[in-house]
Amino acid sequence: MALHQASGRWRLGLLLALITAACWASLPIALKVTLEQLDAITLTWFRFLVATVVMLGWLAWRGGLSAFGGLDRKRWWHLSAAALLLIGNYVFYLLGVQHTTPANAQLLIQLAPLLMALGGIFVFREIYQFGQWCGLAIIACGLVLFFSDQLKGAALGTQAYLIGSAAVIFAAVVWAGYALIQKQLLLRLGSQSILFFIYLVASLVLLPFSQPQKVLSLDTKHAWA
């Protein structure tokens, strides 16, 4: 089986990663505010719905909807698995934010890129240079120190705090699995096509469990959040 290979455009990848990190930094605060009036499932469904509409417009404009025509059964299974994993990531991360603090959730979710990096080594046989290994070791040490501090505080914490932390860690694990599957799918599909399929499936799967009428009743503060 052909495996995904790095494109070598590391500067673009670094820039996109930094932009993503900046968005992630503000996300838990906005989610915590919105969760005051919406449950985690409804909020996740709405996020997927908006993303589906945006991606549909983009692909229709760029003519990218035809990319799904030549996929074999294996690729469809990969797409379905990626969709389920990302649904799990969104839902469990929101549950974590709901039961713990935005700061704690944002720090714990950093386990996700570390697991993805390790997966790239073992699954895609990516070769790391010395500097990359040093960076990976620093991140791992920082996470270990943070986790040990959290475990000390957990003994004094509430059950809700522990449940929230566990939910965020699980969200990180399933996100790493999603990211690795997505990398393999990039051999046949563009990232926009992959995300459109995932967002569409997620919005349909979560619809029966959500309460769309609550979105329409949000006040100004929570609607902007």
Residue ranges and their predicted role:
Residues 23-28, 62-109, 145, 224:
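Specific transmembrane alpha-helical segments of multi-pass solute transporters/efflux pumps
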Residues 55, 80, 118-119, 128-150, ...:
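Hydrophobic transmembrane alpha-helices of multi-pass small-molecule transport proteins
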Residues 36-43, 91-111, 187-193:
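Structural motif at transmembrane-helix junctions in multi-pass transporters
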